Swiss-Prot record:
The keyword Ribonucleoprotein applies. This is Large ribosomal subunit protein bL9. Belongs to the bacterial ribosomal protein bL9 family. It comes from Chloroflexus aurantiacus (strain ATCC 29366 / DSM 635 / J-10-fl). Keywords: Ribonucleoprotein, Ribosomal protein, RNA-binding, rRNA-binding. SUPFAM superfamilies: L9 N-domain-like (SSF55658), Ribosomal protein L9 C-domain (SSF55653).
Length: 148
């Protein structure tokens, strides 16, 4: 029996795939639970159209992320903070601070969790901070911390 998967099914396949399953598995599990429908010509055509639309949307998002990555690579964020002895900061510069400054300076909205700052910055200097925009698309952002 050929079925079109509506959801990801563990050990079987991903949503949108057409799979050949035993009749009992299809009738007793996949169809009643709503995990799949019978693979008719119209269902297959609709699934192909959905997959094509998803691919187009993903490609557009990837192009947008690559353009943003190029823009981030050219940016330099400068933080002016109070410092104590040996150029140590009072406080620190965190990934949330970098995200807020990025929005303030360049109007770019990035989730703080995508900024790959391992530990908060606690000293003055120049830092290269990785930013993971999406899977496979990343950039580095130059952050300069100077004392008052």
């Amino acid at each position: 029996m050929k079925v079109l998967l509506l959801q990801d099914v563990e050990h079987l396949g991903k949503a949108g795939e057409i799979k050949d399953v035993s009749g009992g598995f299809g009738r007793n599990y996949l169809l009643p639970k709503g995990f799949a429908v019978l693979a008719t010509k119209s269902q297959v055509k609709q699934a192909e159209e959905r997959l094509a639309a998803q691919r187009r949307k993903a490609e557009a998002a990837r192009k947008e992320a690559e353009a943003l990555a190029a823009r981030l690579a050219e940016l330099t964020l400068t933080f002016t903070v109070k410092v104590g002895e040996q150029d140590r900061l009072y406080g620190s510069v965190t990934n949330a601070d970098i995200a807020a400054k990025l929005h303030e300076v360049a109007g770019i909205e990035i989730d703080r969790r995508k900024i790959g700052l391992e530990d908060p910055i606690k000293r003055t200097g120049e830092y290269e901070v990785p930013v993971e925009l999406m899977s496979g698309v990343s950039s580095t952002l130059k952050v300069v911390v100077v004392g008052e």
